[in-house]
Amino acid sequence: MLLGWQQNYRNWASTQQIYNRLISNISTLYPLPSTLYPLSVRLPLPQFSIGAKNPQHIAEVIETSTCEFLAQCLEPEDLKLAVMPTFGSIVKAADEESGNQILAVVYHATTAPIDSVHRARALGMSLDELREEQPQIFAMLKTEFKAAIIGFEDDKGQMYQYLPPRPPQIHQGVYQCDKEEIIRFSEQLEFLRTLLQVQGAPVEALTAATIREIHHLRSRDRSWLVTAGRTVSLILKDDYDRLRYVLSQIR
């Protein structure tokens, strides 16, 4: 019987051979001069981890700023596209210096080739057919999302609904917030004002999506939904068209 590390190494060696055979097919998807393709690509040695992966760990911060951050989704272990977090969902990442957990709402997501010069092209194949005939495609794609910062939780567990002193550092892990965290955070609704001011986002649709998400997590608590609607009404009291648009999507 093989030991765990022996089986992992055998799997790695097999993957190395398969990848080197498949690399020659890349030119059919993203044509380049043949001299630019390596004859062989050496994959990194496997990392033998003892602990189980946290299923809420979905991405890593690759760009950060005061009001938002950009994150790249972690690659799945099988031949699948990385799973995007849903529009309007709440995620978190840490500021290691202060111990704060930064909360943010996902407002934009993309999947694109890692190579920014050569675009993907239509192949007329289903995803199952691609996994069978062109599995290297999935290693050549990246999924990224932008999240607008709406508040933070300090190291004592206190929630705040304004911008933190610092955003999360680059390369920090991004996690999905659990139900209890979102319920505690949404006891106050000042974050809705921040959402309605996010630059470069469809803020009315984003606000409505976030309200629907929280309403679902709160077991469709009608009193909370009414309070959220009233809060939006106060914020947008001078803009009836925007107010009507938001309210029409949360009923």
Give residue ranges: language-model regions.
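Charge/polar-rich, low-complexity and marginally structured segments
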Residues: I137-R251
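Short, well-ordered loop/turn sites that connect or cap secondary structure elements
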Residues: A82-T86
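Short, solvent-exposed secondary-structure boundary/capping segments
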Residues: E68-C73, A112-M125, A147
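Intrinsic disorder
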Residues: L22, S27-Y30, S34-Y37
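A structural micro-motif recognizing beta-strand termini
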Residues: Q72-K80
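Short, basic/aromatic beta-hairpin or loop at an interaction surface
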Residues: Q56-C73
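Short beta-strand-centered aromatic/proline hotspots
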Residues: I58-V61, N100-T111
